[in-house]
Design a protein with these regions (language model features):
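Aromatic-lined, polymer-binding surfaces characteristic
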Residues: 53, 64-67, 83-218
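Intrinsically disordered or highly flexible coil/loop and linker segments, enriched in small
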Residues: 33-36, 73, 158
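Low-complexity, Ser/Thr/Pro/Gly-enriched N-terminal "stalk/linker" regions
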Residues: 1-55, 88-93
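HEAT-repeat alpha-solenoid elements in large eukaryotic scaffold proteins
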Residues: 61-74
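Generic, low-specificity signal for short hydrophobic/alpha-helical stretches with a mild N-terminal bias
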Residues: 2-9, 42, 76, 104, ...
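Short coil/linker segments at helix-helix boundaries
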Residues: 76-82
Length: 218
C-alpha cells in the first residue's frame, strides 16, 4: 500500500489533504460501533488493550485536526464529503469515549497512564478545530469531555516529554474557556526547561537521551 504514495507530489494544502484521506481510508472498518476505539490489529503492548484501541483512535487526529482547522476549497466534492464523514465519526468517538456510562468509555486515569500520551492529540485537534470538535457538543458532553481530560492534572506524569502533554491539555482548556491549572503549567514548564541540553536539544528525562517530541510540541 505504501508504494502508491511514494513519489506523490505535495504542492498545496489540497494535495496534503487528499493524501491524508487516502492514507486513513482503509481504517474505517476497524472502528468500534461507537467510534471511540480503533482496533487495527493485534500486537503486544504493556498498557492494555483498551488503551491500545484508544491510542489508535487518537493518533489519527494528528492528521485530521489540521485538516479541519480551515477550509480546503480545492478539494473535490467527494473528498469534502469524506472529510465531513470523518468529523461525525470523531465527534461520536469523543462523546462516547468520555462518557463513563458508555461501553466504550476510555476509562479513568491512574498515575503515569499511557492515555496521557493520547490526550496530546485530542488537545491539539480541539485547539486547532474547536468548531468541529468542541462547539457541536452539548453542555453535558462538554462537561464530560473536560472532566475526562482534566484527570491529567490530578495524576503523576513522568518527568520527561510527557509533561508537554499536560501543557497541551491546559493550553487547550485556556483556548476553549475551561478551567485550567496555572500551577501545573508552571511546574511542567520547569521540568521541560530542566531537560534542555543546549543548541535546541532536550533530553527525554535522562541526560544524553535526546528527544524529538519536545521540539515537535513547541
Amino acid at each position: 500500500m505504501i508504494e502508491k504514495w511514494k513519489g506523490r507530489t505535495i504542492q498545496s494544502r489540497a494535495d496534503a489533504a487528499e493524501l491524508l484521506l487516502d492514507m486513513i481510508r482503509p481504517l474505517k472498518p476497524y472502528y468500534s460501533k461507537g467510534n471511540a476505539w480503533l482496533h487495527a490489529g493485534d500486537s503486544g503492548v504493556h498498557y492494555g488493550e483498551k488503551s491500545s484501541r484508544m491510542e489508535g483512535f487518537a493518533r489519527v487526529l494528528w492528521g485530521l485536526g489540521p485538516l479541519w482547522s480551515q477550509e480546503s476549497p480545492a478539494l473535490s466534492k467527494e473528498l469534502k464529503e469524506e472529510a465531513e464523514e470523518w468529523k461525525q465519526r470523531y465527534l461520536s468517538g469523543i462523546i462516547h469515549g468520555t462518557d463513563p456510562s458508555h461501553e466504550e468509555y476510555w476509562g479513568d486515569l491512574v498515575d503515569y497512564d499511557q492515555k496521557m500520551v493520547e490526550m496530546a492529540a485530542l488537545a491539539v485537534a480541539v485547539s486547532l478545530s474547536p468548531k468541529t470538535l468542541w462547539e457541536p457538543l452539548n453542555t453535558e458532553q462538554k462537561k464530560r469531555f473536560f472532566c475526562w481530560m482534566n484527570q491529567i492534572n490530578d495524576h503523576g506524569v513522568h518527568p520527561n516529554n510527557w509533561r508537554f502533554f499536560r501543557i497541551l491539555v491546559n493550553t487547550m482548556f485556556r483556548m476553549i474557556g475551561c478551567p485550567w491549572s496555572k500551577e501545573r503549567m508552571e511546574e511542567d514548564r520547569a521540568v521541560i526547561e530542566g531537560c534542555y541540553e543546549g543548541d535546541g536539544w532536550y533530553h527525554d528525562g535522562n541526560k544524553g537521551q535526546l528527544d524529538y517530541y519536545i521540539p515537535f510540541a513547541i
